[in-house]
Amino acid sequence: MLGWTLTFLVIALVAGVLGFTGIAGAAAGIAKIIFFVFVVLLLISLVSRALSGKPPRP
């Protein structure tokens, strides 16, 4: 039980440091950009698969 307490304490301290230093805002901005890049790549992949006429892999 003490191990879990220490683990959550460390996680809370790291989250607090990241949240109060402004790194979290930058990381959220980067995450949004990466999300939209991968959505576009997914759509390109789906369209190219549909146009090629290949059946999906089993």
Swiss-Prot record:
Signal peptide: none
Key words of the record: Cell membrane, Membrane, Transmembrane, Transmembrane helix
Any GO CC annotation of this UniProt entry: plasma membrane
Pfam families xref list: DUF1328
Keyword Cell membrane belongs to the record: yes
Topology class, membrane: Multi-pass membrane protein
Subcellular localization, as worded in the UniProt entry: Cell membrane
Family statement: Belongs to the UPF0391 family.
Name this protein carries in UniProt: UPF0391 membrane protein Sden_3712
Source organism (scientific name): Shewanella denitrificans (strain OS217 / ATCC BAA-1090 / DSM 15013)
